Amino acid sequence: MKKVFVKTYGCQMNEYDSDKMVDVLNATQGMEPTDNVEDADVILFNTCSIREKAQEKVFSELGRMKALKAAKPDLVIGVGGCVASQEGASIVSRAPYVDVVFGPQTLHRLPDLINRRQQTGLSQVDISFPEIEKFDHLPPARVDGPSAFVSIMEGCSKYCSYCVVPYTRGEEVSRPFEDVLAEVAGLAEQGVREVTLLGQNVNAYRGAMGGTSEIADFALLIEYVADIPGIERIRYTTSHPKEFTSRLIELYGRCDKLVNHLHLPVQHASDRVLAGMKRGYSVLEYKSIIRRLRALRPDMSMSSDFIVGFPGETDADFDKLMAMVHEIGYDTSFSFIFSPRPGTPAANLHDDTPHEVKLRRLQLLQATIEENVQRISQSMVGTVQRILVEGPARKDPTELHGRTENNRVVNFALPGVPQAQRDRMIGQMVDVNVTQAFPHSLRGEFVVRQ
């Protein structure tokens, strides 16, 4: 049986796409995934171009594949994702041993691209944008555990000044309303209890409702997903403050299946910097969303993306960012130094801030966020948390592990509980009393419901 190895860079959208690459090759060519690159008949790199460092990692990885390709001439090497969209045929020019190059919207054509490469001996490149076509050609999802990603829309139409996503993934296109619900229902029938709805700007979803001219917004989609039997938790990422409607906020007051955790990227806390980024909202507007959400859910956990060192960022601008991090109390977040991307407006902005200053700012920001993370984890000690059990604990298979609503891994023992009963708990919701907080996980005790 042939095997496929996939290395994924970047966001959860890429993780979802990588799973679909495996699914489509399994359905059409009977390939099975492998974690050992040397065992693979097909090696795929699903790439990210959001920062220069991530992009260069891909070419470094490709360089290491040259010897493997020489030893196995029939090996197929493919590059997908956003670097593929951005670089296209130049990838083959730089690494002639690459066989196929495909974009996020053409991954469903992967079997045909591989076949054409094998028949013609020529590298194949397809980085077109056939909108939402790929979802019509993908096989049903293969379930691996009680949680699953569901892509509901593709692309981005916001054109932030620093971002390549609109150029590499195309404009915003939403999947039809009924198609999304059918996929979620199919996952629920296979034992999935938690879905994460995915999109570059997931709350910009506007899906056509079959047989009518009506359009479903994101809040309506969530309401319908919540009504699907078996679904107990709903997450989504990545949301955009500009698309955060009152309807969506109000949903947190009446939909218990929406978790108490939200990733809402602010990027910065200076209105001047936000304007330069072309984010389309003010700091006050962003804070208003948080205030209204926490009025409904006082324990709402917030995470974000942050960019430091954007051209023209002053010490005063950075101080505003740090003040907001303290004020909001952000949980685990993503933070980076500004990386100019070719073809974006921000790449042409004058930047006179020394790299050492940017690095110092980033380190301070990350240290403060980590303090918040540890404080939040410590505050959970002594509380009973509802856990979705994912499987045996990694370090001790006699224990189980799962996740809290705010996305923390909890390992817990079940003294006196027979193995067969433990196995049945996987995929179920259980109560766990948190007893210890560690840097990257929690520990607890199983609570028997009376």
Swiss-Prot record:
Q: Which residues bind [4Fe-4S] cluster 1?
A: 11, 48, 82
Query: Which CDD domains does the protein's record reference?
Result: Radical_SAM
Transmembrane spans:
none
- EC number(s) stated in the UniProt entry for this protein: 2.8.4.3
What's a GO cellular component annotated to this UniProt protein? cytosol
A GO molecular function term, named singly, is:
N6-isopentenyladenosine methylthiotransferase activity
Q: Which domain of life is it from?
A: Bacteria
Where does the record place it?
Cytoplasm
Keywords for the protein's UniProt record, in alphabetical order:
4Fe-4S, Cytoplasm, Iron, Iron-sulfur, Metal-binding, S-adenosyl-L-methionine, Transferase, tRNA processing
Could you tell me what reaction this enzyme catalyses?
Answer: N(6)-dimethylallyladenosine(37) in tRNA + (sulfur carrier)-SH + AH2 + 2 S-adenosyl-L-methionine = 2-methylsulfanyl-N(6)-dimethylallyladenosine(37) in tRNA + (sulfur carrier)-H + 5'-deoxyadenosine + L-methionine + A + S-adenosyl-L-homocysteine + 2 H(+)
**Where is [4Fe-4S] cluster 2 annotated to bind?**
156, 160, 163
**The protein's required cofactors:** [4Fe-4S] cluster
Q: Which residues form the MTTase N-terminal domain?
A: 2-119
Domain TRAM, which positions? 378-448
On cofactor binding, the record's note says:
Binds 2 [4Fe-4S] clusters. One cluster is coordinated with 3 cysteines and an exchangeable S-adenosyl-L-methionine.
| Limits of the Radical SAM core domain | 142-375
Extract the HAMAP family matched here: tRNA_metthiotr_MiaB (MF_01864)
Q: Which PANTHER family match?
A: CDK5 REGULATORY SUBUNIT-ASSOCIATED PROTEIN 1, MITOCHONDRIAL TRNA METHYLTHIOTRANSFERASE CDK5RAP1
The subunit field of the Swiss-Prot or TrEMBL record says:
Monomer.
Q: Per the similarity annotation, which family is this?
A: Belongs to the methylthiotransferase family. MiaB subfamily.
Q: What does this protein do?
A: Catalyzes the methylthiolation of N6-(dimethylallyl)adenosine (i(6)A), leading to the formation of 2-methylthio-N6-(dimethylallyl)adenosine (ms(2)i(6)A) at position 37 in tRNAs that read codons beginning with uridine.
Q: What is this protein called?
A: tRNA-2-methylthio-N(6)-dimethylallyladenosine synthase
Q: Which gene encodes it?
A: miaB
